[in-house]
């Protein structure tokens, strides 16, 4: 089941990636930390697999973390934050990290996440703060049962 969940999650993420650029202006210049200067060499598919294979997330929590991550991702879209080839790795790794901190009983520290994701501890801390600000400090985004069901159906 876990492998199937990850594959479906990857398919969902691939359908969310767009060529649309995130427009940076005075109101949202904090998003710069979420955008890579250069397109990462590792594909988003391999990057997601690496995160889930690392055992940093308990396998029994995969589904909950995936659903929570997709929910947060949908909320970010309403803020004009999209996944593209320069932002997907940073946004997804940070959203998965935030989701694991909510779901996992004993989540790993940011140092472990930084090492796994190939960024500095300072960068992961900045990305975490940025996403929390963009999410209006609300990691428990409340959605209707129908919206939750739609997200679940889109993945599974």
Where are these regions (language model features)?
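Alpha-helical bundle/repeat cores within regulatory domains of eukaryotic proteins
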Residues: 88-94, 99, 103-121, 128, ...
């Amino acid at each position: 089941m876990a492998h199937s969940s990850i594959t479906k999650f990857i398919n969902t993420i691939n359908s969310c990636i767009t060529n649309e650029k995130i427009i940076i202006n005075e109101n949202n210049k904090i998003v710069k930390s979420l955008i890579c200067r250069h397109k990462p060499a590792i594909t988003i598919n391999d990057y997601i697999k690496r995160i889930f294979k690392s055992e940093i997330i308990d396998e029994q929590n995969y589904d909950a973390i995936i659903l929570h991550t997709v929910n947060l991702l949908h909320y970010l879209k309403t803020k004009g934050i999209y996944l593209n080839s320069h932002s997907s790795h940073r946004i997804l790794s940070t959203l998965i990290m935030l989701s694991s901190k909510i779901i996992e009983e004993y989540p790993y520290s940011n140092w472990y996440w930084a090492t796994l994701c190939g960024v500095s501890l300072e960068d992961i801390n900045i990305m975490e703060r940025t996403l929390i600000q963009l999410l209006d400090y609300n990691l428990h985004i409340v959605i209707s049962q129908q919206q939750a069901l739609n997200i679940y159906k889109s993945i599974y």
